[in-house]
Design a protein with these regions (language model features):
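Redox cofactor-anchoring modules in respiratory/redox and cofactor-processing assemblies
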Residues: 1-192
Length: 192
């Protein structure tokens, strides 16, 4: 649906306004800007917070329930979260590997092909997502992909700094956030 609400409404209030999560299930993840922003987990552990937020909030707060976050562009900027376009809510039974692959394939087909970083990069991301979903990657290969200096981060950085348009900067986000925030879900797809 389409909802127009005041700045500052919480994520929980918006989801309730939209009818809640299907079947009364609990929230697993949310994409605040559609696939462009990637997947934000329902519970955001302190280690995943931007440093500026870690300094602002008391040390005894170990995690934040994303449902309690106020939806205001300035707050989202502080949290390094995107806000805009469509918001997608994923219930506990959602397969985020499947969802990430669908997003990666979407970006691959949406690339106009004019710039090489986006054309090649979005294709490579979709290939990696396909290998993950088909169970062709080992645990060690998946761990390498998830590192801050791994090939996904390097590819994302190259795409962001050399792509002609914004598509190249956001195309890696579904896979990057999947690997960062949902390692247990990714491991279920690992080849023994």
């Amino acid at each position: 649906g389409v909802y127009e609400v005041e700045n500052g409404i919480t994520v929980r209030e918006l989801i309730e306004l939209a009818g809640g999560i299907r079947g009364g299930e609990t929230l697993k993840a949310i994409a605040f800007s559609g696939p462009s922003g990637g997947f934000t987990p329902a519970i955001l552990p302190r280690g995943a917070w931007p440093r500026k937020i870690q300094r602002l909030l008391p040390a005894n707060i170990e995690q934040v329930n994303i449902l309690d976050l106020q939806m205001h562009i300035n707050y989202f900027r502080l949290w390094d979260l995107m806000l805009g376009a469509g918001i997608v809510v994923y219930a506990q039974d959602a397969d985020l590997v499947d969802q990430a692959l669908a997003c990666l394939r979407f970006y691959q087909t949406e690339s106009c092909g004019k710039c090489v970083p986006c054309r090649i990069g979005s294709t490579k991301l979709a290939e990696i997502g396909g290998e993950l979903a088909e169970g062709r990657l080992t645990r060690s290969e998946l761990e390498e992909l998830a590192t801050e200096t791994g090939p996904i981060t390097e590819l994302a950085s190259t795409m962001a700094s050399t792509a002609i348009c914004g598509l190249g900067t956001v195309a890696p986000n579904p896979l990057m956030t999947l690997l960062r925030f949902f390692p247990e879900e990714v491991r279920r797809y690992a080849r023994p």
